[in-house]
Structures are given as C-alpha cells and as structure tokens.
C-alpha cells in the first residue's frame, strides 16, 4: 500500500541519518565555490589538532567545525588526524572507528565546506590528512621508514606535502629510550620525504611546492631567541625549499607555534613562485586555539602562480 511504502521510505531515511552519526549533526556548508577569484587565491591552513581533536570529540565537533568555518580555508592540512581515545580514555576499537577520525573524515570535512579529502599512510595513531574545497590528486603516500608518515597531493597545479616527524629524543624503535637518536632519525625521515617529492627527478618539471606540518625540530632562524640547537633537519629542508614562510615573513621576530609559547616546531616551506604570491601569514591566537591543541594553526594566503603544471 502507499502508506506502507511511505513508512518504509521514512524508516530508510531515518537509518541513513543514524549512520551519518555525530559527523552529520550539523548541516553541511556548500562545497567548492568555483570562480576565477577563488581559483587565483588560496587560503591554506596547517594545524596539528592533537589526537584527532579529542578536545571537541564529545561535543560532536561543533566548536571545531564552527571555528574552521570562521577561518574558511581553501586547503586544510592536518596532523594527528585520528581519534584513538574514546570517552572513557580507552583505545578506540575498529568497531567504533566509523564514529571517529579518520574513518569519518569526509563527513566532518563536509560540515566546513570541503567535499574532498585525502588520508596519509595510516600506520600508527597519528596520520596526516588533507581536506579541500577543490579536487585533490593524491600523488603519493609516503610511509616506509617514517614514524607518522607524509602525504603528497596536488591541487590546482600546486604540490602540497604534509608531514609529521618523530617527536621523541630517542629514535623510533629504541626500547631503552636512552639512545638520544631522535634528531638523527628526524633527519633521515626528512631526507626520505625530500627524495620522494621535490628532489625526485620524476618531478623535475614541477616548480610550485609547499611542505608543511609538525617538524618537531628547530629552525636556525630562531637561534637569536632560544640559543643554539640542532638544526640538521632544517638545514636539509632549506637546501630544497627557498622560504620558511613564517620565519621569512616575520623576519627578526619569534613567532611560536605551540600554545606554551616557547617553541616554533610547525612550519610551512615553499618555493619561489609561491613565495612571490604570498599575501597574508598568521599564527592563529584565539579562544578556541588556546584550548583545542598544544599547537597553533598557521594560515597562509597566496596567489596561485600563473604557470602551473
């Protein structure tokens, strides 16, 4: 009967809503907004969201979504894109994962207007991910020999690499935790990432690159503010990338990327063509970022180079 069919359709619709769960709790913003102006200017945000934004996990991510909407990035690079603790601070099981990140990243990203997502090699609880208003071409997921991995994507002719280097003083795999090999391991991670991306001969024709994320290491540009540290990671990076965007934009200043205000370990590097188009740079300080993570987000606006491959 018509009434039975109507009831069946209603039940199916209700079931679909339940499957969407917490990530569909708020209406999705419209996705890509095509237009010449948007295609020419990119607003990039890089953020280590700390344990898959565990801070707002039990609020249906409503505050996080509202905050991302106010920032309105075109491209969003995220470190620690997995939730691995449930509300009882127990490890999230495989059965629970569809409720959380990264399994439901696409549903969460839709809420802030990004219909496109990409997830790096999910080899531990700290994957890197991208969300975007524009189509994402996944060039490669880089995991071998790395702790948290790296993700290389291409969006509108620009190459983006997001990474998260090893955070400890000791090297990965050292069970004694006393070898003090952490920095050497980070250098090897960076060497692998550079060799796979910007230094790879097969990408010789690619001129426009950005590399970002949590480097867990210090820059020589900040030596006047914190004294001498080990700069091997960034010396290696600077041999391939000409600009540390925050360090060069705020030349002569110390702009920490941690909420504690004592360290700059999150970076966005770029090549000359990108740097020439940079219009705005900001490390975001507000009521949300003061509490949501131990890292602060970095926002960069740049004009897309005219010639992109």
For the regions a language model picked out, list residue spans one by one.
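Secondary-structure boundary/capping positions in well-ordered alpha/beta enzyme cores
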Residues: 74-75, 115, 240, 244
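Structured beta-strand-rich core segments of catalytic domains in phosphoester-bond hydrolases
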Residues: 81-168
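N-terminal, active-site-proximal structural segment of metallo-dependent hydrolase catalytic domains
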Residues: 5, 9, 15, 25-110, ...
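Serine residues within intrinsically disordered or low-complexity segments
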Residues: 1-3
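Active-site regions of metal-assisted phosphoester/phosphodiester hydrolases
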Residues: 31-67, 128-309
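Classical Sec-dependent N-terminal signal peptides that target proteins to the secretory pathway
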Residues: 21-22
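Short beta-strand and adjacent tight-turn residues that come in two discontinuous sequence segments
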Residues: 78, 119, 270
């Amino acid at each position: 009967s018509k009434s039975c069919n109507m009831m069946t359709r209603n039940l199916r619709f209700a079931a679909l809503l339940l499957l969407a769960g917490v990530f569909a709790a708020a209406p999705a913003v419209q996705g890509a907004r095509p237009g010449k102006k948007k295609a020419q200017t990119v607003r990039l945000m890089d953020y280590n969201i700390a344990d898959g934004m565990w801070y707002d996990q039990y609020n249906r991510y409503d505050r996080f979504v509202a905050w991302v909407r106010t920032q309105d990035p075109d491209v969003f690079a995220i470190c620690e894109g997995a939730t691995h603790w449930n509300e009882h601070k127990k490890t999230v099981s495989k059965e629970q994962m569809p409720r959380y990140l990264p399994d439901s990243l696409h549903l969460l990203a839709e809420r802030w207007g990004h219909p496109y997502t990409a997830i790096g090699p999910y080899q531990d609880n700290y994957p890197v991910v991208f969300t975007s208003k524009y189509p994402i071409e996944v060039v490669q997921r880089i995991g071998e020999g790395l702790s948290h991995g790296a993700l290389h994507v291409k969006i509108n002719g620009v190459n983006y690499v997001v990474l998260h280097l090893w955070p400890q003083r000791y090297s990965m795999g050292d069970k004694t935790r006393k070898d003090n090999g952490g920095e050497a391991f980070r250098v090897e991670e960076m060497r692998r990432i550079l060799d796979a991306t910007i230094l790879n001969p097969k990408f010789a024709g690619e001129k426009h690159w950005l590399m970002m994320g949590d480097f867990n290491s210090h820059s020589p540009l900040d030596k006047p503010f914190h004294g001498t540290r080990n700069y091997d990671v960034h010396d290696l990076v600077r041999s391939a990338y000409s600009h540390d965007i925050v360090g060069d934009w705020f030349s002569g200043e110390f702009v920490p990327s941690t909420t504690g205000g004592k360290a700059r370990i999150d970076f966005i590097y770029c090549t000359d063509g990108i740097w020439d188009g940079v219009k705005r740079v900001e490390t975001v300080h507000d009521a949300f970022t003061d509490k949501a993570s131990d890292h602060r987000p970095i926002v960069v606006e740049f004009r897309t180079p005219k010639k992109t491959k």
